Amino acid sequence: MNNTGVWDVVVIGSGPGGYAAAFRASDLGKRVLLIERDEKLGGVCLNRGCIPSKALLHIVKIVNEAQHLSKVGVSFGDPKFDVKKIRNHKNKIISQLNGGISQLAKARKVSVLSGKASFVTNSEILVETKEGDEKIKFKNCIIASGSSSSMLPNVPK
């Protein structure tokens, strides 16, 4: 990425808060760089947290509702779960939403950089990318690093 010049706004983190801030700043005419440590936009919420959980919970809800229909005279056999298909369904939802965020970033002319950001000064950050380190200068920075996923105790990995 050619990072000559100074960015008006750098946003660290591309979760719901980060990409919304980046898009709004761009809509207001700012030159915006969105930095995400993962390869895909969306942060923990989209890639490993809220959205995957909701996709799986939706399946459970449908199965539960189908089982309760027997009370009103509609019966189904015992459910059979194809874990591979369920995983593919979840991954498809994530992929579609990742693509949507990427398209919105492109349409709004928000530049995206994959890497881990750390502050060098109050107007410069260092981004560790797969291609090497990049120094980024900015006027304003929004830290939207969000959350990190955690494992529940006593639940096997």
List the predicted regions and their residue ranges.
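Residues forming the Rossmann-fold NAD(P)(H) cofactor-binding site
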Residues: Y19
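Glycine-rich Rossmann-fold phosphate-binding loop(s) that bind the pyrophosphate
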Residues: G13-P16
